[in-house]
C-alpha cells in the first residue's frame, strides 16, 4: 500500500491517529499517501462509536474540511473543533505602490496580522504532534520498513503500550522515593 501526496510531496503512507488529551493512541490507521485527510479520517472513525462510548468531542487540524466535520456530527453525533492558526484564512491585501496607505487601515491590518507567519502555540494541536515525536525514538517507526500497513499499526500499538507501562512504573516508584 503506497501512494503519493502532491500537496505535501510525500511518497508512501500516511498515519492517521486518534489520541486522547494526553497523547495516548486510541486508534491508528495506515493508508496510502494519496488518500486525503478527510478520507483517512473517515476510515479511522469507521465502526468506532461502540468502542469509545465516552468520546464526545474531537479536535482536528485544518486538513479536515467542513464536509468531514458534518459527516462526523451526523454519523457519530460528536462535536468537532478545527484547531487552526489565528491567521489561517488571512492572506494579506493588495495595495498599489503609487498610492499612500491609509493609517486607519494600517492599524486594522496590524491587528489582523499579529503573529502572522511567526511561531504560534496552538492549543490542542500539539498533542498529536507530540505523539508522532514519541515515535521517532523508536527506530522501527522512524521509517516505514514494513510491507503490510497492519504491521506498522501493530508496532505503533506496541510502542504506545511500552510508553504507557513506563509511565505507570514511574508513578509507582515516585511515592516510594519520597
Language-model segments: which ranges?
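Generic helix-packing signal
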Residues: 45, 135, 163-165
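C-terminal domain-tail junction helix/linker
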Residues: 151-178
Amino acid at each position: 500500500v503506497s501512494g503519493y501526496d502532491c500537496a505535501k510531496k510525500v511518497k508512501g503512507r500516511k498515519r492517521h491517529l486518534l489520541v486522547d488529551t494526553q497523547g495516548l493512541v486510541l486508534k491508528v490507521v495506515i493508508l496510502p499517501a494519496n488518500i486525503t485527510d478527510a478520507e483517512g479520517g473517515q476510515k479511522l472513525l469507521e465502526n468506532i462509536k461502540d468502542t469509545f462510548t465516552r468520546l464526545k468531542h474531537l479536535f482536528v487540524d485544518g486538513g479536515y474540511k467542513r464536509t468531514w466535520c458534518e459527516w462526523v456530527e451526523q454519523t457519530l453525533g460528536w462535536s468537532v473543533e478545527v484547531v487552526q492558526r489565528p491567521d489561517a484564512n488571512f492572506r494579506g491585501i493588495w495595495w498599489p505602490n503609487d498610492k499612500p496607505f491609509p493609517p486607519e487601515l494600517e492599524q486594522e491590518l496590524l491587528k489582523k496580522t499579529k503573529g502572522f507567519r511567526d511561531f504560534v502555540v496552538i492549543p490542542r494541536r500539539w498533542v498529536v504532534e507530540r505523539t508522532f515525536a514519541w515515535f521517532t525514538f523508536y527506530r522501527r517507526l522512524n521509517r516505514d520498513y514494513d510491507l503490510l500497513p497492519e504491521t506498522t499499526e501493530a508496532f505503533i500499538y506496541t510502542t504506545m503500550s511500552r510508553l504507557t507501562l513506563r509511565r505507570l512504573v514511574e508513578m509507582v516508584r515516585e511515592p516510594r522515593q519520597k
